Protein backbone atom coordinates (compact mmCIF):
# COMPACT_ATOMS: atom_id res chain seq x y z
CA UNK A 1 0.00 0.00 0.00
CA UNK A 2 1.22 3.49 -0.83
CA UNK A 3 2.05 5.90 1.98
CA UNK A 4 -0.50 8.45 3.12
CA UNK A 5 1.30 11.74 2.45
CA UNK A 6 0.73 15.16 0.93
CA UNK A 7 0.69 14.92 -2.86
CA UNK A 8 -0.36 11.24 -3.04
CA UNK A 9 -2.85 10.64 -5.86
CA UNK A 10 -5.88 8.57 -4.78
CA UNK A 11 -9.11 7.16 -6.18
CA UNK A 12 -12.32 7.66 -4.19
CA UNK A 13 -14.02 4.29 -3.56
CA UNK A 14 -17.05 5.28 -1.50
CA UNK A 15 -19.61 8.07 -1.58
CA UNK A 16 -21.10 10.15 -4.36
CA UNK A 17 -17.64 10.94 -5.79
CA UNK A 18 -16.60 7.26 -6.07
CA UNK A 19 -14.28 6.62 -9.01
CA UNK A 20 -12.92 10.17 -9.15
CA UNK A 21 -9.25 11.11 -8.84
CA UNK A 22 -8.13 13.14 -5.85
CA UNK A 23 -4.92 14.29 -4.16
CA UNK A 24 -4.11 14.45 -0.45
CA UNK A 25 -3.40 18.09 0.43
CA UNK A 26 -3.19 17.75 4.22
CA UNK A 27 -2.99 14.92 6.76
CA UNK A 28 -5.21 15.71 9.76
CA UNK A 29 -4.71 12.62 11.95
CA UNK A 30 -4.46 8.84 11.65
CA UNK A 31 -8.00 8.54 10.23
CA UNK A 32 -8.65 11.70 8.21
CA UNK A 33 -7.03 13.74 5.44
CA UNK A 34 -8.08 16.73 3.32
CA UNK A 35 -8.46 15.86 -0.37
CA UNK A 36 -8.92 17.95 -3.51
CA UNK A 37 -8.75 17.51 -7.27
CA UNK A 38 -11.65 16.33 -9.40
CA UNK A 39 -13.67 16.15 -6.16
CA UNK A 40 -14.85 18.92 -3.86
CA UNK A 41 -12.17 19.89 -1.33
CA UNK A 42 -13.14 18.22 1.94
CA UNK A 43 -12.09 16.10 4.87
CA UNK A 44 -12.13 12.41 4.00
CA UNK A 45 -11.83 9.19 5.99
CA UNK A 46 -8.92 6.97 4.94
CA UNK A 47 -11.38 4.11 4.38
CA UNK A 48 -13.14 6.06 1.61
CA UNK A 49 -10.28 6.14 -0.91
CA UNK A 50 -7.49 3.97 -2.29
CA UNK A 51 -4.02 5.53 -2.64
CA UNK A 52 -2.14 4.88 -5.89
CA UNK A 53 1.58 4.67 -6.53
CA UNK A 54 1.52 8.11 -8.20
CA UNK A 55 2.53 11.32 -6.42
CA UNK A 56 2.47 14.97 -7.48
CA UNK A 57 4.70 17.69 -6.08
CA UNK A 58 2.54 19.79 -3.73
CA UNK A 59 3.07 21.73 -0.54
CA UNK A 60 0.85 21.19 2.50
CA UNK A 61 -2.52 22.98 2.22
CA UNK A 62 -2.02 23.83 -1.48
CA UNK A 63 -4.85 25.76 -3.12
CA UNK A 64 -7.38 24.12 -5.44
CA UNK A 65 -5.80 25.85 -8.45
CA UNK A 66 -2.34 24.49 -7.56
CA UNK A 67 -3.77 20.98 -7.18
CA UNK A 68 -5.53 21.11 -10.56
CA UNK A 69 -2.40 22.46 -12.27
CA UNK A 70 -0.28 19.66 -10.76
CA UNK A 71 -2.79 16.98 -11.82
CA UNK A 72 -3.01 18.45 -15.32
CA UNK A 73 0.80 18.57 -15.64
CA UNK A 74 0.99 14.91 -14.58
CA UNK A 75 -1.71 13.97 -17.10
CA UNK A 76 -4.08 12.68 -14.41
CA UNK A 77 -6.98 15.11 -14.77
From Swiss-Prot:
GO MF annotations in UniProt: RNA binding; structural constituent of ribosome
Superkingdom per UniProt: Archaea
Keywords: Ribonucleoprotein, Ribosomal protein
GO biological process: ribosomal large subunit biogenesis; translation
GO cellular component: cytosolic large ribosomal subunit
InterPro entries per the UniProt record, alphabetical: KOW, Rib_uL2_dom2, Ribosomal_eL14, Ribosomal_eL14_arc, Translation_prot_SH3-like_sf
Keyword set includes Ribosomal protein: yes
Keyword Zinc: no
Coiled coil regions in record: none
Family, as annotated: Belongs to the eukaryotic ribosomal protein eL14 family.
NCBIfam families: PRK04333.1
Protein name in UniProt: Large ribosomal subunit protein eL14
The organism of origin for this protein: Methanococcus maripaludis (strain C5 / ATCC BAA-1333)
Amino acid sequence: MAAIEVGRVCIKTLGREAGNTCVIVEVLDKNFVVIDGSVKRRRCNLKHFEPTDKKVDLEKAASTEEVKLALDAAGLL
